[in-house]
Amino acid sequence: MYLLLLLIMLNMLMMSMIYLFMLFMNKMKNNLNLIIGNLIIINLLLNLFNLNWIDWIYIFCNLSFNMYSYGLIMLTLWIFGLIFISLNNNSLNCLFMNLLLMISLLLVFLSMNLLLFYLFYEFGLLLIFYLVVKWGYSENRWLSGFYLMFYTMIFSLPMLYIIYYIYLIDYSLNFMLMEMLNLNLNMMLFIYLLMSFLVKIPIYLFHGWLLKAHVEAPYYGSMILASIMLKLGGYGMLRLMIIYKNEFILIQKILVMINSFGVLILSLMCLSQFDMKSIIAISSIVHMGLMIMSMMTFLKISLIGGYLMMISHGLSSSGLFFLVNVIYSQTNSRLMFINKGMINFMPSMSLLWFMLCSSNMGSPVSLNLISEVMLLIGMISWLKFMMLILMMYCLFSFIYSIYLFMFINHGKIFIMFKIKNGILVEYFVLLLHWIPLNLMFLKLYFI
């Protein structure tokens, strides 16, 4: 009892210190972005003790949350809170679009109706398209926006017909009812429905749009894409796996085979990239490929591991994209050949590079390690032969993470002008990426 009271008092003290620190930053930089970000972070911290109270489902007007969506809702609020704190763009249009996108993504995770899920899902894609083409870095942002809309809409528009077909057969689009009815769907329609989610994860062979979008998107667009938008596909797959388990079993070996080769090929591609954003974007596809591959085993440990992978990767990839922006804002380049020897200019930021790169490759005690161990156990339990492929994945993941860190922070210096070590807000945002990523293992019983 006394230990519980002590923990609560320490938590209140920590929140008070963070709140005072945020107020201090508001005095230093008084704008609406920081105020909104502060409110989101504080409200989120107040709910951290409720993570184990998610066994029940609250339903109101087809909106609900349960174990599958609660963690992703928390991730969405956390990432957008950090984005609002770090925004340098004082445009109300930019702030409004990010707020609208946050609400849209929250409604996706809260939707218990397939049609509402689809509508909010596509509305979020339109908003991220607008962010890319409006605040992108170069003229190629229009081409990136075209890739984004072409790859996603070519599978998303027929999904509306499939939803209508499901309603004609089952007379309901409610996820809870569809789970209880144990429904079956025509195999061709099921594959098309599944592809609309796999393209957005994205699966190997359909990943071209993500690389284009990441390279041209503003830093907050990349943070949203990597940490939340990719997880929409994984969340949709989780919902479908419960409803259409028989159909998934028929194609599980095909998906495992495609993703096992894709994980290895894309890991090698990381070692041939010179753009920092490209390496982080490809590593995101690799992590999502491992998640799909393991979830296809339908083992409980694999499903939990995939769920934790979505949360952990959302934090680590978002932090890495923010680090790239810290360098880009001073050198106007993302090429690793130019941005070398950064440890001489910004030693404190180099430490954060190492902390987030090590978390990204699954080092102790990050949540990435726990999720990857669960996924590897699930795969090896399903098929012993997968051990060889998974060993190669772990090796390549370590190599490209160290390659990214070493190439940027060490080596001969090419930059001849002065670089600052970073500002207070940047360190605060980066620490709020790393701290929950490495402390969440203390409270895993909520799963």
Swiss-Prot record:
Cellular component aspect of the GO annotation: mitochondrial membrane
Gene Ontology process terms (BP): ATP synthesis coupled electron transport; electron transport coupled proton transport
Residues spanning the signal sequence: none
Compartment(s) where it occurs, according to its Swiss-Prot or TrEMBL record: Mitochondrion membrane
Class of enzymatic activity (EC top level): translocase
Membrane topology term: Multi-pass membrane protein
EC numbers: 7.1.1.2
Listed name of the protein: NADH-ubiquinone oxidoreductase chain 4
Taxonomic lineage from the root: Eukaryota, Metazoa, Ecdysozoa, Arthropoda, Hexapoda
